[in-house]
Amino acid sequence: MMQPKKTKFRKAHKGRIHGTASSGATLAFGQFGLKAMAPERISARQIEAARRALTRHMKRAGRVWIRVFPDVPVSKKPAEVRMGSGKGAPELWVVRVKPGRVLFEIDGVGAQTAKEALTLAAAKLPIKTRFVARIAE
């Protein structure tokens, strides 16, 4: 699973996701992509599950680019612990995704296979997504 090798701080504020994505909103590498349509936190486990679904459906043909990286730690207190006594220990890593952000890109497969693979990947994510394709030039 993806997580940073080294961070400046161990814990992060909860934060809010405002506005729409300006960077990472267009296809940069592949011919087809999966674009987020809502603001959401996506965990490293969910990204990995989507990646596996993608590559398995494509039968390891073509190429996959993951355009997001989970760099925000989410802390959690243990079960049955009283409130107070500070913030909990880091539990998982997430990425804050704004609407319009491209999550995955693929290339080297047909349009039908790409759409099916990205639909399977989208089912693993807690967010509404849209299939996008590069306009034929």
Curated annotation (Swiss-Prot):
Keywords: Ribonucleoprotein, Ribosomal protein, RNA-binding, rRNA-binding, tRNA-binding. GO terms for molecular function: rRNA binding; structural constituent of ribosome; tRNA binding. InterPro entries: Ribosomal_uL16 (IPR047873), Ribosomal_uL16_bact-type (IPR000114), Ribosomal_uL16_CS (IPR020798), Ribosomal_uL16_dom (IPR016180), Ribosomal_uL16_sf (IPR036920). PROSITE patterns: RIBOSOMAL_L16_1, RIBOSOMAL_L16_2. The keyword Membrane does not apply. Disulfide bonds: none annotated. SUPFAM superfamilies: Ribosomal protein L16p/L10e. GO terms for cellular component: cytosolic large ribosomal subunit. GO terms for biological process: translation. Belongs to the universal ribosomal protein uL16 family. Binds 23S rRNA and is also seen to make contacts with the A and possibly P site tRNAs. Part of the 50S ribosomal subunit. This is Large ribosomal subunit protein uL16. It comes from Nitrobacter hamburgensis (strain DSM 10229 / NCIMB 13809 / X14). The lineage of its organism: Bacteria, Pseudomonadati, Pseudomonadota, Alphaproteobacteria, Hyphomicrobiales.
